[in-house]
From Swiss-Prot:
GO terms for molecular function: GMP reductase activity; metal ion binding. It is an enzyme of class 1 (oxidoreductase). Keywords: Metal-binding, NADP, Oxidoreductase, Potassium, Purine metabolism. CDD domains: IMPDH (cd00381). Its EC number is 1.7.1.7. PANTHER family: GMP REDUCTASE. Belongs to the IMPDH/GMPR family. GuaC type 1 subfamily. This is GMP reductase. NADP(+) binds at residues 26-27, 78, 132-134, 183-184, 272, 288-289, 317-320. It comes from Onchocerca volvulus. It catalyses: IMP + NH4(+) + NADP(+) = GMP + NADPH + 2 H(+).
Amino acid sequence: MPTIENEPKLDFKDVLLRPKRSTLKSRADVDLVREFVFRNSKKKYVGIPIVASNMDTVGTFEVAESLSKKRLFTTIHKHYSVDQWMEFVNRISSNQDILSQIGISSGISDYDFTKLKKICGLIPELQYICLDVANGYSEVFVDFIRRVREEFPRHTIFAGNVVTGEMTEELILSGADVVKVGIGSGSVCTTRKKAGVGYPQLSAVLECADASHGLNGHVMSDGGCTNPGDVAKALGAGADFVMIGGLFAGHDQCGGDTVEKDGQKYKLFYGMSSDTAMEKHEGSVAEYRASEGKTITVPYRGDISKTVQDLLGGLRSACTYTGAKKLKELSKRATFVRVTQQTNEQYATFEISPSELQNLNIAV
């Protein structure tokens, strides 16, 4: 019979990190680099564990080139052809280190598996695979993880998405190294409206991280971050990686058409289960499906490097406030307080961007 879980589940908006005594003298003293050895692949990762989402408007080769300069990771979207992959590898031939900070994404069809084998065979330096479905609870998905693990025993596998501890354990035991956590939390996802299914992201990360770490596995919080503070909360809750879509949208390096409205530039950004994505990549929305994503216009934001600086600065600040000398220590130092209000919004409607400020005529 139907049941109700009465324990409250929390999202990033429901909490703040409590400040704690700190010996740090400057944000510059914080070490954001993490090192992991993965459970199944046995491979070592070194970098800053912020990951660009494998959406076709975010997980682009151009984004990967920019983020790798700061040791951030990119999961390349699955719609690039084999030829496009080879063109990219040839273009970065003088800087092959980029390949250590990117992963190839794949669906779970036989076609996807064949394409994955071909690309990984042509590019042996590519060591990360992201297996991505909206619903990570299906037996078909678990079987596909086992199939990929058998074919690629030394590759590191990201797999998801799920939101509960028992399924996190299932995916890890089936061959995944990093489980992606999040259903319905993305900025352009409408699964919670269309299907009524989901889980508040902070609680999902807390529970899945606990399950994963008990097996020496790892988790990646995917979705729900609206600002750098949310990224810090996800890491404080136990996420080893944080995947970002909306915060990285709208930049020069991103996909999505550029449009103009009222003299202002915007870029299209859409969910990968939206009408826009399905019509672009599959020709139409299948008659048995409903769109579970939306299409929006994001104000044009220029080069992605400024957003990266803002994210990393926010993380360093979170660490100094909580007394974490290294990002590794943040989850050990984190105490969350439940709140009814995040920020003072008195002048929110009057806020202007740096570019708007430059265009103002200052009265003398």
